[in-house]
Structure formats: C-alpha cells, structure tokens
Amino acid sequence: MPISVYAQTELTGPITHVRDGDTIEVGEIAIRLNGLTCDERGTALGDRATAYLRLQIIDKFATCFLNGERTYDRLVGRCATEELGDIGAHLIAQQLCGRCTRYDSTGIYEDAQKRAGRYAGAIPSYCRPS
C-alpha cells in the first residue's frame, strides 16, 4: 500500500507549474512556500514575481521540506533547487516577495529580508504575528 504524500516530510521532483510567487507544483503536488508572502497575480509585483519564478524554476528539480500543514489544496513547506537554493530566500533577495513573519517564526528569512530591505508589496494581515 503506497504511503500518502501528506504524511511525508520531504518531497523531491521536478517543478511542473508556478501558480504564483508563493505557490509551486512539484509533480502534481501543490506547495505553498512557508514563511513567504508575494503580491497576488493581477498586480504588477505579483505578476513580476510569478513570471520571474517561472523562468527560473520550471522543469528544475526541487527538494521540499513539508511542515505537515495544509492550506486549501496545498501542502506547506520550504523548497530549494540546486540553481537558486532556497526559493523563498531567493525571491526575497530579488525584492519580489517578502517575509511572512507569522509563518517564519524561527526567523529563517529574517536575514534575507534585512539584506533586501523593506518589501515593496502588501503584507497581508495573516502575516503579522498573532
């Protein structure tokens, strides 16, 4: 009997789709990049983040570390490619996305955000510490 992907803590495979700046698909599995916020598609910054990410990672091999949470149809975790390293940190460094403080409680992206400067996009209320 196969093990459910939802029970896995690590997922590896090709990136097949970029939904937007903070959601990718590895194979057929949607991953919400944890600790990251990007403006929505349909906004200038959101469209730039999505287009940039598509150019950088489609068909690249990713390793994702899942945290066991779900949001809508997506699993939640941090993903990296050999070319970019941590995708979230890379998008912050490019000033295309920002740190979502509430979901980066261990501060993994804190230094990346400090180096990049203030995020120019909108920080949603759910990113503020509760």
Regions of interest found by a model, annotated:
Residues 2-130:
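Small beta-barrel nucleic-acid-binding modules, primarily SNase/OB-fold domains
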